[in-house]
Structure formats: structure tokens, C-alpha cells
């Protein structure tokens, strides 16, 4: 997910996106713990997407 795409979204859409990412992160962690996760790079990718969304939410709250 590109930061440029995220910047165009509203705070409400960002909160929804954050919730979806956190759910996906949970599911990926459960798959990794049970040994079912084949694409381990997704853990890092989702973690960084969560950070991007949280950063933008903080920026929009301050503005």
C-alpha cells in the first residue's frame, strides 16, 4: 500500500483500514505460529502498513 494512496483517504477510512490490517496481522501471526504460513514476508509488509496508517492518523489529528 502506497502512502500517497493513504493520504487521499479520510480519517474514517483510515480507521477502517487500520482495523482491517490489524485483523489481517492477527491471522498471519496465528498461521505463522501453527506453521501454516508460506509467505512470511507478509508479516513485515502488514506491520509496515499498520505503521503507515497510524502515522497518517497522527498527522491528520495534529492538523
From Swiss-Prot:
Which superkingdom?
A: Bacteria
GO MF:
structural constituent of ribosome
Is-annotated flag, keyword Ribosomal protein? yes
A GO term (biological process) for this protein? Answer: translation
- Entry keyword set: Ribonucleoprotein, Ribosomal protein
Q: Name one GO cellular component term.
A: cytosolic large ribosomal subunit
Task: Identify its protein family.
Answer: Belongs to the universal ribosomal protein uL29 family.
Q: What is this protein called?
A: Large ribosomal subunit protein uL29
- Whose protein is this, by species? Cronobacter sakazakii (strain ATCC BAA-894)
Amino acid at each position: 500500500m502506497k502512502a500517497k494512496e493513504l493520504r487521499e483517504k479520510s480519517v474514517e477510512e483510515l480507521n477502517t483500514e487500520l482495523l482491517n490490517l490489524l485483523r489481517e496481522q492477527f491471522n498471519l501471526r496465528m498461521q505463522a505460529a501453527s506453521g501454516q504460513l508460506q509467505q512470511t514476508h507478509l508479516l513485515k509488509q502488514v506491520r509496515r502498513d499498520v505503521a503507515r496508517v497510524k502515522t497518517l492518523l497522527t498527522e491528520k489529528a495534529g492538523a
